[in-house]
Amino acid sequence: MSAEYTCRSTNPWADSSTIYAGLVVNAVLDLDILHEKQKELISLWPILGGTVVQSTKPWSFTCGSNVDFESRTLDETVSTHFPNNWGNMTGPSASTTLDPAIVDAKFLFAIKPAPSTIFRIRVTVLRDATLVCFGITHQVTGAGGCFEVVSAFCDLLANRAIPHFALPPDARGLKLSDHITGGDDNVTSDELGDFEPPEKNWNIGVVKAATMMWRVLIAQFWKTLGLREKLTEKYIHLPGDWVDEVRNQAQKELSSLPESSDVELTRNDIISAWYLKTIHGPSSSSGCDTTPVDFYVAINYKGLLNPNTTGGCSEKGPSAEQQQTQYLHHSVAIFRCMFSAYQLQNDSISSIAWRIRRATLHYKQPSSIKKYVRFVEKNNSNLLVVDIRASNPFSMVGLSSWTTYNYMALDFSGAIGDRKAPQDGVRVTFVNPLALSPISGLTLYTLKDGKGGYVIRTANTKTQWKQLEKSSSMENLFPVL
């Protein structure tokens, strides 16, 4: 299958990005089995064996049988690089021993600066564990599709059947905007002016995009000179009980307000609101800091697509075989929730979480998704860069939530071969999310720790890290308690 395919509903912003899921598995796995199962997966889903064609706009891809697999063996233990240092903390705590840059280097090796293969696996075998890293071109799929690929890989390890392969609908000539289920009449009112059409969230064309990228380079230059604080990445652990306590208290506050009494906050809303509020700290003066803060949220809309798009189904609906058909697609819409520094400094965490929930509900509506997909279809040959209102582009925060992807439940026992499995089973003990993109250091990754809590990966300045450490007590979050 050497033909070139183009997804006309994928935002070209994803073209030059790669998404990686690095997994720590608590057993020594058999390299030959892992390699053979990658070959089998590619033979069944040939899009994973294809290459990226960068000469087209937007980028195209081919299907094929390329197997990009590299491995190495290190005479080290897993505790050397992944110490369990969360302890019994009752509130958020930043790791002092896990450095994301060092962790990335343990997963990512033998990777070209601009790899042409769509799918790659890197395996590092330790004395008592295995690091397995799955990488996929972001233009082909998002975080949800990445989890689908890893899940299918584990199904093959267990000798379970996986769905049949199909090309993405928009690579087969369909306009996804015409196949999103739901009407256009359920539109949330916008008294607060929170919601913007997609074209307001993006810099379109070479001139505007280049101007935005120039601002990023200038900001990076000031950091290099020491005129602005540098960003440092860390992992943060949030105990599940603490998240629930904050959520319950915030929900109690909202229930007393008529305009928000029917809104049910999610744990992700609370985590995002807490993060935004704490990194901006308390108000340093009596003045109004109007510095804009853009919070971008990525929404997976694949569930809104009509099932009939999965392979030319009849009007009677998909057949049993077509219901078992799988396609990979970057079905991600990106929307902005707008704040000011003053709001984040002075509004309650419940108010901030409410605004995030309200915006998310609005942007998840089929009408909003349709507008976004139509915008992408219209501009898929243009250069797009997210809009950042502040003069410092590193003030923007983009949320990449992995909390719905249960990597901890994946079973790698089919890859241990003749070795003895650990008493507690062959399981994933740590997940390292990463999307290598043109602008790094702006993403807030959230995922579950497998024990009821949450892990955040993000970058902050030294001042922001200090503020985060000081602002996590219930007394500071809810002063009236």
From Swiss-Prot:
User: Where do transmembrane segments lie in this chain?
Assistant: none
- InterPro entries with a match to the protein in the record: CAT-like_dom_sf (IPR023213)
Q: Where is the active site?
A: 164 (proton acceptor), 411 (proton acceptor)
Q: Which UniProt keywords are present, listed alphabetically? A: Acyltransferase, Transferase
Per its UniProt entry, which superkingdom is the organism in? Eukaryota
Look up keyword Repressor and say if it applies. no
Name the Gene Ontology molecular function terms of this record: acyltransferase activity
Q: What is its EC number?
A: 2.3.1.-
Per the record, what phenotype accompanies loss of this gene's function?
Answer: Does not affect the biosynthesis of penifulvin A.
Assembly notes: Monomer.
Q: What does this protein do?
A: Acetyltransferase; part of the gene cluster that mediates the biosynthesis of penifulvin A, a potent insecticidal sesquiterpene that features a [5.5.5.6]dioxafenestrane ring. The first step of the pathway is performed by the sesquiterpene cyclase peniA that generates the angular triquinane scaffold silphinene via cyclization of the linear farnesyl pyrophosphate (FPP). The cytochrome P450 monooxygenase peniB and the flavin-dependent monooxygenase peniC then catalyze a series of oxidation reactions to transform silphinene into penifulvin A.
Indicate the family of this protein.
Answer: Belongs to the plant acyltransferase family.
Q: What is this protein called?
A: Acetyltransferase peniE
